[in-house]
C-alpha cells in the first residue's frame, strides 16, 4: 500500500497543490482574533470574516481574498512558525510538530462531513462580521499567549 504524500514528505517538500490540500477547510483561521495591547494575548472570537461562507466554511473569494480583506493571512512554509495561534487540529501545525492527521481530516475521511459532525469547523458557531457590533462580546475562550 502506498503511503499518502503527507506521510512521506516534509512540509517543505510538498507541491503547492499538496500544501493547499492540507487545509481541512474548518474556517478557524477565518474567525477574527483580538489582541490585548498591553499583554499581547490573543483572544479568539466567533466573528467570521466577511468573505467566509459560514455554511461551507470556505472563502467566497479565495483567489482575490487579499483585495477584499487586506488583513487575511497567507499561511506559507516560511511563516508557519509565526502563527502560534493555529488550532491544535490544524494539519499544518500537526505535521510541523511531527504528528499525524486526525481521522476526520478530509484527506483521510474523503469528505468534510466528519469534521463538521465533530464540531471542528466553525459552521455551528460563527456569526457574520456584519451582524456584530462589539467583537469583545463574542470572545470564545481564554487568551492564547504569544511566544
From Swiss-Prot:
What Pfam families does the entry give?
CxxCxxCC
**InterPro entries referenced in this protein's UniProt entry, alphabetically:** Puta_zinc/iron-chelating_dom, UCP006173
Top-rank taxon, per record: Bacteria
Q: Where is the signal peptide?
A: none
What family does the entry list?
A: Belongs to the UPF0260 family.
Please identify the protein, giving its name as recorded. Answer: UPF0260 protein PMI1174
